[in-house]
């Protein structure tokens, strides 16, 4: 599906033209742990709402040469903004965000997808993470001094 029309053929012009679709796809990062974790060979995309499963499969196999095995789609309803949240009798919808179409694309079993690291972690962020980890360790050591403190009283009385 494309919004461009093929030009009329004129003698001497080449006939082969490639029209790319007007669709868009965006990779969504999925959690690496928990119940929402996806298998290694599954990739989550937010796609143009007009795309069908067949369009998604063709887009990925023909343009990006990916080994697509299965495509599953889901339409997520956009959030609704109400004029009054608590008055259930007279509340009216003021605004609704557009619906999103999510595609779960399963690749062949030997394919492993990892979310691309777009920006390298800066030195400040790495240093801040080290400091935070160090603070947590110190906090745990301090808590160990006071944890179960009352249990030591028996040692003094039994002497």
Curated annotation (Swiss-Prot):
One of its GO terms (molecular function) is structural constituent of ribosome. One of its GO terms (cellular component) is mitochondrial large ribosomal subunit. GO terms for biological process: mitochondrial translation. InterPro entries: Nucleotide-bd_a/b_plait_sf, Ribosomal_uL23-like, Ribosomal_uL23/eL15/eS24_sf. It is found in: Mitochondrion. It holds the Pfam family Ribosomal_L23. Keywords: Mitochondrion, Ribonucleoprotein, Ribosomal protein. Component of the mitochondrial ribosome large subunit (39S) which comprises a 16S rRNA and about 50 distinct proteins. PANTHER family: LARGE RIBOSOMAL SUBUNIT PROTEIN UL23M, RIBOSOMAL PROTEIN L23-RELATED. Belongs to the universal ribosomal protein uL23 family. This is Large ribosomal subunit protein uL23m. It comes from Caenorhabditis briggsae. The lineage of its organism: Eukaryota, Metazoa, Ecdysozoa, Nematoda, Chromadorea.
